[in-house]
Amino acid sequence: MKTYIPKDEDINREWFVVDAENMVLGRLATQIANKLRGKDKAMFTPHVDTGDFVVVLNADKIKVTGNKMDQKTYYKHTNHPGGLKERTLKVMLEKKPEVVIETAVRGMLPKNRLGKQMIKKLKVYAGTEHPHTAQQPKVLEF
């Protein structure tokens, strides 16, 4: 018997909505990464993108444990000499809360072309409104 490898037409991608309010960042990110990879499906194959679309709401209301609000730092570089900028998690949640969840999930996905394809299926919003109601997303509870 040959090993089954899913084709593009065999993969049924669904849309899910996650409310991130009062959820711990790392635990939420692992669940989202598993959905994006498709690890919860029977047809999971490491070299094929079998994952679903995930819409995350209330990204600004996530929780973290310990002192991470003040101690966890995010770095970016402006590509100019001396242009290394750093922000704490507290500042990031005030300015760009979407980036916090995207960064956490991106770190849990493969670091190759497939990972870039998977992260495009993640949609993160700070409020409760999102433009993906036409896809009729299912509510996902963790």
From Swiss-Prot:
PANTHER family: LARGE RIBOSOMAL SUBUNIT PROTEIN UL13M, RIBOSOMAL PROTEIN L13. HAMAP family: Ribosomal_uL13 (MF_01366). One of its GO terms (cellular component) is cytosolic large ribosomal subunit. It comes from Maridesulfovibrio salexigens (strain ATCC 14822 / DSM 2638 / NCIMB 8403 / VKM B-1763) (Desulfovibrio salexigens). Belongs to the universal ribosomal protein uL13 family. Keywords: Ribonucleoprotein, Ribosomal protein. This protein is one of the early assembly proteins of the 50S ribosomal subunit, although it is not seen to bind rRNA by itself. It is important during the early stages of 50S assembly. Part of the 50S ribosomal subunit. GO terms for biological process: negative regulation of translation; translation. This is Large ribosomal subunit protein uL13. Transmembrane segments: none annotated. NCBIfam families: rplM_bact.
